[in-house]
């Protein structure tokens, strides 16, 4: 199967179905939570990162490319103010221990290979309400077919 761009819906659906998080959302909701804080945790935000296409040629007016796409899952837990971080850190560890095998090696229908975990890092941006965050970066590959100028 071919996809013109990275499609996050099947990734979000897989994470939601596993029941690891109180909620799973996208970039717009992440900005709101960063400004206002959150009620309950853990919560996840699935966002696109980048795409790196490698064109493999044009045939019959169709550009073919192999694309390596990056996406991130940001996990937020709370509340650092209440417990000096112990509960929040435990939540991050527990959720990540289930998230990584959930995505690693799996691939949505449009992918030409499995999801691979690339790295993880602490989210250091301003988070309100005592939230602590962890960002896991993943890659997946897919084929892109785009009809060129008609």
Residue ranges and their predicted role:
Residues 1-41, 45-150:
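Charged, amphipathic alpha-helical segments and their flanking helix caps
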């Amino acid at each position: 199967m071919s996809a013109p761009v990275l499609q996050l819906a099947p990734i979000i659906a897989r994470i939601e179905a596993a029941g690891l998080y109180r909620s799973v959302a996208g970039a717009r909701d992440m900005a709101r939570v960063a400004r206002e804080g959150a009620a309950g945790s853990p919560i996840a935000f699935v966002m696109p990162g980048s795409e790196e296409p490698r064109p493999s040629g044009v045939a019959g007016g169709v550009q073919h490319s192999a694309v390596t796409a990056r996406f991130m899952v940001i996990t937020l837990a709370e509340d650092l103010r209440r417990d000096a971080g112990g509960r929040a850190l435990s939540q991050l560890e527990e959720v990540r221990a289930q998230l990584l095998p959930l995505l690693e090696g799996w691939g949505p229908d449009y992918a030409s290979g499995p999801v691979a975990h690339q790295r993880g890092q602490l989210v250091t941006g301003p988070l309100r309400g005592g939230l602590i965050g962890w960002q896991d970066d993943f890659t997946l590959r897919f084929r892109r077919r785009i009809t060129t100028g008609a």
